[in-house]
Amino acid sequence: MVAFTEKQDALVSSSFEAFKANIPQYSVVFYTSILEKAPAAKDLFSFLANGVDPTNPKLTGHAEKLFALVRDSAGQLKASGTVVADAALGSVHAQKAVTDPQFVVVKEALLKTIKAAVGDKWSDELSRAWEVAYDELAAAIKKA
């Protein structure tokens, strides 16, 4: 069980709204960061076959869904101290054989993207809130 405060939840929620304000731009930041660190990740996402295209609705849709899952995980942590992931989500990640280092690359890209979205509102406290929510979601996906 993880202690996640009201303030941490509010930090994640407000910065998620900053991300949503320009999903095409921040989707490019996110997926470009992933591919810079792990070019082979391109094979895990069918919508990256032709590179990072901000006009591709699958690219922006997947980014929004992932960031929303982390935001929802923050809410679950605040409410119950645990995150429960959908079994289908776990199954997809297992089928694609997503590794722990790949989860780390995604976390780093997520943090870089949120930092870009919030600008000078970025702080260690904000970073930590996203890290905890993401780490707990990743753990739940691996168990699902």
UniProtKB/Swiss-Prot annotation:
Keywords: Acetylation, Cytoplasm, Heme, Iron, Metal-binding, Nitration, Nitrogen fixation, Nodulation, Nucleus, Oxygen transport, Phosphoprotein, Transport. The modification Nitrated tyrosine is found at residues 26, 31, 134. The modification Phosphoserine is found at residue 46. One of its GO terms (cellular component) is cytosol. InterPro entries: Globin, Globin-like_sf, Globin/Proto, Leghaemoglobin-like, Leghaemoglobin_Fe_BS. The modification N-acetylvaline is found at residue 2. Induction: Negatively regulated by cobalt (Co) in a dose-dependent manner. Induced by hydrogen sulfide H(2)S. Suppressed by exposure to excess nitrogen (N); this repression is associated with nodule greening and reduced biological nitrogen fixation (BN) efficiency. Induced by iron-based nanomaterial (Fe-NMs). One of its GO terms (molecular function) is heme binding. It comes from the Eukaryota. Leghemoglobin that reversibly binds oxygen O(2) through a pentacoordinated heme iron. In root nodules, facilitates the diffusion of oxygen to the bacteroids while preventing the bacterial nitrogenase from being inactivated by buffering dioxygen, nitric oxide and carbon monoxide, and promoting the formation of reactive oxygen species (ROS, e.g. H(2)O(2)). This role is essential for symbiotic nitrogen fixation (SNF). This is Leghemoglobin 3.
